[in-house]
Amino acid sequence: SLFQLIGRTHEVYGSELLGPIVISMTHAASDVLTVLLLAKWAGCKTIPQITPLFESVPDLKDAPRILESLFTLGIYREHLTSHHNEQMVMIGYSDSNKDGGYLMANWSLYEAQEEITRVAQKHNIKLTIFHGRGGTIARGGGPANSAIRAQPAGSINGRFRLTEQGEIIALRYSNPGLAHRHLEQIASAVILA
C-alpha cells in the first residue's frame, strides 16, 4: 500500500514532491531491486529514485561491487534512464564508527567514496553521495566546510547532499545570521571541491 500511495501522490502532485527512497542497511543489489519490483507491482507509473544506504564497514567495502552489479542490469539501467542517469548513494557514519572505531570508519568511508565514484564514472552515471552525518565527531559531525573539502577527488562534482541531525539544527539554524553563514560555507565547499 505504501507504493500505491507513492503512485497516487505522483499522479496528483507530481513526481518531484517526494524525495528518494532510502534503503537502510543495503547489503546486496537485491535490496535495491526489491524496491523496484514492489513499485512496479503496485503500478507506480513513476518510480522515485532509489538510494542504497551503506552503513557498516563490510557494506561500505561491498558498495562498489553492489553498484557495479546494479549498473549492468538492464532493468536497473532503465530506471536510471528515467532519472537522467543519476544515482544517489547514501553513506552512514554512525554504524561504521561502531564497527571499526573512528579511524577505521573514516578510512572505510573515504575508500568507499573513491570506489563508488570510479564505478559511477565507468558507467557514465551522475553520482550524488548523500552523507548521513550526525552532530558528534563519532557520527561524522564537525565543521561541514572542512568535511566537504576533505572528500575524495571527483566524488562531489558539484553534487552533494547531507543530513543535518536534530541535535545540531538549533545550533546551526536558530539564528538567521548563523544559518546564512553555515549555508554559505557548505555552498562554497561544494563549489571548491
Predicted features, each with a name:
Residues 40-193:
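Catalytic or ion-translocation cores adjacent to nucleophile or general acid/base/metal-coordination motifs
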Residues 1-11:
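Extended, charge-enriched "interface" segments that sit outside catalytic cores
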Residues 13-15, 44:
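Short, flexible turn/loop "capping" segments at secondary-structure junctions
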